Amino acid sequence: MSSMTPREIVQELDKHIIGQDSAKRAVAIALRNRWRRMQIDEGLREEVTPKNILMIGPTGVGKTEIARRLAKLADAPFIKVEATKFTEVGYVGRDVESIIRDLADMAIKLLREKEMTKVENRALDAAEERILDALLPPARSFNSDAPVEKESAARQVFRKKLREGTLDDKEIDIEIKATPVGVEIMAPPGMEEMTSQLQSMFSNMSGDRKRTKRMKVAEAMKKVKDEEAAKLVNEEEIKQRALRAVEENGIVFIDEIDKVAKRSETSSADVSREGVQRDLLPLIEGCTVSTKFGMLKTDHILFIASGAFHLAKPSDLIPELQGRLPIRVELDALSPSDFQRILTEPNASLTEQYVALMKTEGVDISFSEGAIQRIAEIAWKVNEKTENIGARRLHTVMEKLLEEVSFAAGDKIRDSFEVTAEYVDKCLGELSEDEDLSRYIL
């Protein structure tokens, strides 16, 4: 679990997301509270439940990006899901409990990867010996020491070549674990747990069967190293630790929560939508979910929900669900100055990406300050005139702007190109002014 302070978390988020300070502060405090809870006495720790968050803001202002970046910072089991993927129990589709099952799967996978990284050097040594055994079968004669010494010397030569990579393309016959046959089972809704258990049963039927396969040394080394690493980690301990991590530090981000809200102006009963909200209630409040690894309590899992709420209102969510999301954060719509900052300030900004892409063709592309300003103005103007899709509009505008440069870059006609305000107006000015054209092209 991350021990970063709220200020450090916000500073890290600032590198990738422009503005939205209140949302950043809310998630930073929520993340830090996970760490704080683990420092207090065990008796009181059980009583401290996470304060779930509801993020409200128009599309394309950074809600999902905050979740993506938070996943990397959290160093805790994290899953992002769309509320629209789920249906009420009894309807065709996935039920909400599968969120927790997926979170458990992800936590085990992450912890397994961490543990395998710890034993990587030992696994590499064992894999090296197996590859050398395949390259140099042991000597048959045991009468004298000479052949053994000779073999040992040859082994050292091959070991050196193997480490240098000169044997990577050589083909060898190596005994590896047989890949279990994948069995696809179509199950009725709500039976995902039974399906996964049946699949694991079929895959375990092959047992530890091995087969000899011919492959290149580089490929064999990777497969054998993974096999050796798997032998060195304790799978049962990983499962127990991962489940504990999910229960204590798990974070679930539910996107598009507004799409399952019943709109106030429509009077028709939308059972499936409201049903999803009702099914989410026990999950967020705290219940026990059955997974293939054992029972899992959701009492201390942090839930962050987000939605644009441009057709529905937060008050259209059922009251019980509103009560379980006590912290409300509103994200601001983007201004032209925000668009300018988005183009230049974040790590791996949009302009930086295009510069790197064009550099691969030997073209040095640059953007003048005036060009950045015009691109931002056009993106904002098109959003105002047509549908407001936030920062995503910049992708459309940039792609249209650099279409000609990108197409001709492979012809090696020029070594450098500066995008100026005049060039932006020439390419996009007419399109942005004509509402009908911008609606379909930008």
Swiss-Prot record:
The keyword ATP-binding applies. ATP binds at I18, G60, V61, G62, K63, T64, E65, D255, E320, R392. It is found in: Cytoplasm. GO terms for cellular component: HslUV protease complex. One of its GO terms (molecular function) is peptidase activity. Pfam families: AAA, AAA_2. CDD domains: RecA-like_HslU. Its main location: cytoplasm. GO terms for biological process: protein unfolding; proteolysis involved in protein catabolic process. Keywords: ATP-binding, Chaperone, Cytoplasm, Nucleotide-binding, Stress response. A double ring-shaped homohexamer of HslV is capped on each side by a ring-shaped HslU homohexamer. The assembly of the HslU/HslV complex is dependent on binding of ATP. ATPase subunit of a proteasome-like degradation complex; this subunit has chaperone activity. The binding of ATP and its subsequent hydrolysis by HslU are essential for unfolding of protein substrates subsequently hydrolyzed by HslV. HslU recognizes the N-terminal part of its protein substrates and unfolds these before they are guided to HslV for hydrolysis. NCBIfam families: hslU, PRK05201.1. Belongs to the ClpX chaperone family. HslU subfamily. This is ATP-dependent protease ATPase subunit HslU. It comes from Hahella chejuensis (strain KCTC 2396).
